[in-house]
Amino acid sequence: MTSTPANTGLKVQAVLFDMDGTLLDSEKLWDLALEDLATALGGDLSARARRRMVGSSLARSIAIMHDDLGIDADPESSGAYLTERAAELFRTSLVWKPGARELLHAVHAAGVPAALVTSTNRPLTEIALDTLGRELFAASVCGDEVVHPKPHPEPYLTAAALVGANPEQCVAIEDSPLGIASAEAAGCVVLAVPSEVAIEPAPTRSVRDSLTGVTLPDLAAMVRSWSDARTEPDGQRT
């Protein structure tokens, strides 16, 4: 459909980036750290349990692992082990996802605020920011800084508030079902770039194989398109 005149001037007020699996190819590093923890606990992590962890907070991932292994271990000890092992890997092996660096720099160069919205805890995020460039972000929200982590909308609502943006004019870029649910519940427009788990298109999101070639005008077009969809009587795209 053609954009209504009221919506033609809509712009992206902020871009809210997930980190693991979206900006950084770090899910593979989490695989290694989680496998090491499972081994230390005397078991093997199932593929199903690992899929459930994608996009989860540290505490939720530990709970999933303990349940999967059928053990009653100390969550604090497991969390400390996992954090230490992940930190070792983050310091030496982080790499960018295709197109992520280019889009992040383009957003920054255009003067559009970027926020990092991650389920990873603050200490590990600070290590990752050495690779990402902390100067490129106007704000960051970590999994240990919210009461309700993803899939609750709190992380994305918090990020939008920190940069002074209306969530409906923010594009959230995510790779996981939990993160997408969080962003959509907050009212954001979502660009999904699946990493470990397949994501289907929906009226509230676009899906791309990677961020390669994605531009700020592309994100602005998504905001306008979703605004148009909300103005339809049935709330659906036409």
Language-model segments: which ranges?
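Alpha-helical substrate-recognition element adjacent to the catalytic core
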Residues: 32-76, 98
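Short, surface-exposed alpha-helical segments at coil->helix boundaries
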Residues: 28-32, 59, 122, 126
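Conserved phosphate-coupling serine/threonine residues in phosphotransfer and NTP-handling enzymes
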Residues: 22, 118-120
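Short beta->alpha linker loops
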Residues: 29, 53, 57, 81, ...
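Asp-based, Mg2+/Mn2+-dependent phosphohydrolase catalytic module
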Residues: 2-13, 105-108, 112, 121-238
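Metal-dependent phosphoesterase signature
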Residues: 65-102, 110
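Active-site neighborhood of HAD-like aspartate-dependent phosphohydrolases
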Residues: 2-51
